[in-house]
UniProtKB/Swiss-Prot annotation:
Sequence ranges assigned to domain ATP-grasp in this UniProt record: 112-323
Record-listed Mg(2+) binding positions: E283, E296
Listed cofactors: Mg(2+); Mn(2+)
Name assigned to this protein: 5-formaminoimidazole-4-carboxamide-1-(beta)-D-ribofuranosyl 5'-monophosphate synthetase
Reactions mediated catalytically: 5-amino-1-(5-phospho-beta-D-ribosyl)imidazole-4-carboxamide + formate + ATP = 5-formamido-1-(5-phospho-D-ribosyl)imidazole-4-carboxamide + ADP + phosphate
UniProt source species: Ignicoccus hospitalis (strain KIN4/I / DSM 18386 / JCM 14125)
Transmembrane region(s): none
Amino acid sequence: MRVTDVLKEYDLSKLTVATVASHSALQIVHGAKKEGLRTLLIVKKDRYEFYSSFSHLVDSFIIVESWKEVLNEDVVNELLASNAVLVPHGSFVEYVGAQGLLDYPVPIFGSRKILLWESDQKKKMELLRRAGIKVPREYRSPDEVDGLVIVKLGGAKGGKGYFLAKTPEEVRRGLEALGNPSNYIIQEYVIGVPAYYHFFYSPIYNRLEITGMDIRYESNVDGLRRLPPELASGIRPSFTVVGNIPVVLRESLLIDVYKYGKSFVRTTEELLGEELVGPFCLESIITEEGEVVVFEFSGRIVAGTNLYVNGSPYSYLYWDEPMSAGRRVAREIRKARDSGRLEEVLR
């Protein structure tokens, strides 16, 4: 069913922002409430006690035994009856699946197709290259490896399963330990400092906004830094994201970051045939020469935005009021509804 047909059946005065209770869900419902919209969380039974403690932010819950139940007809019907707009995030994509979201009958805020590209490491890097964004060298097979590399799995896994290697044999052993996955890439490991840039593209305001940035706090690689070299030697680093740290970039670097964001939005529309709407993230390493090298993107809200529930230094420059990424999503939805332009932001 097309979004146009679904919206004809909706009571737009009771439009409801809905998402899966994980990742950035609390920020999303908090932002929706700030913009006067109704809220709904799909929550696993074993998580209900925690999320129900925020019942002042959530108008209704749909309780499920497993995330795959999100695709069930009874859940879909309840969402449609609630006039729901789904806001996808990393857990939504990982647990439900980008393919499942592609044909989902409930309106989704933002682009559906970008979630498919995000889940495929090779397509992801192709999009970045086509956008003219500087990316690390990529190796087509373990045999080509001739220096330090990072091997990365596809999907929104929060860095789980990533590993470092220096030789073809180390890459093969690492892949074998992971069950020889098919969706992976081998990238040059760029030396520098990480920085992850949060963007929001708005069709309603016709502009790209930088809404914040962060650094990921990863286990065990960040813990290894506390050990003396003689003790850390021989311990294999891993990159499972457990939290986020705020960062403000040198203002001169923002110019290149903004150019990358603009190019990403333009290229996404050219390749996917639909406009990118709402939050996305470019994930980078900045070298000692000040070069921004982008190694990943996320085509939806990222968990790093949870740092800025009361707004970031950058979002305040646009709005002069507290504006989280979750509230920014809700404002775009509300403004689109009030101006009769919902079809421009929903897919």
